[in-house]
Amino acid sequence: MVSNFFHVIQVFEKSATLISKTEHIGFVIYSWRKSTTHLGSRRKFAISIYLSEVSLQKYDCPFSGTSFVVFSLFLICAMAGDVVYADIKTVRTSPLELAFPLQRSVSFNFSTVHKSCPAKDWKVHKGKCYWIAETKKSWNKSQNDCAINNSYLMVIQDITAMVRFNI
């Protein structure tokens, strides 16, 4: 549960500016909890939230009342289910933005984080992104580099893992 919360916080922090311009968010949650009619089957819940543009314009801070309500609903849904699918439609403000409609979809699975990697030199393995440095640095300097890139150091414990990552 703590791991799920950490991933949800990361998603929220990265999308705070997007949420402040959001007019519609839809969530789909797949739950492994047993239902009364189909024991053991997956149940699908859909939650759709429409936020009027006027109510969002009242708040300048992305962590304001509206965003907090949206985040709280997302957090509750994420904790209750296994997979969260979010469909986010944002409001365009500049004339150039209005020419191109924006529809964003985010797929999130708490067992493995599915996302596109930050740059081409990162490797994807089992839904997670890895970057292997070309130069050797101390542990502390490497940790600082990871913190700057919002990532963590990978610890390789056996030769099999090294082969998988072509090290």
UniProtKB/Swiss-Prot annotation:
Disulfide bonds, paired cysteine numbers: none
Membrane-crossing segments per the record: 68-88
Domain C-type lectin: 116-167
Recorded coiled-coil stretches: none
Primary location recorded for the protein, binned into one broad class: membrane
Record's protein name: Putative C-type lectin-like domain family 1
GO biological process, any: positive regulation of interleukin-4 production
Domain of life where this protein originates: Eukaryota
Lineage: Eukaryota, Metazoa, Chordata, Craniata, Vertebrata
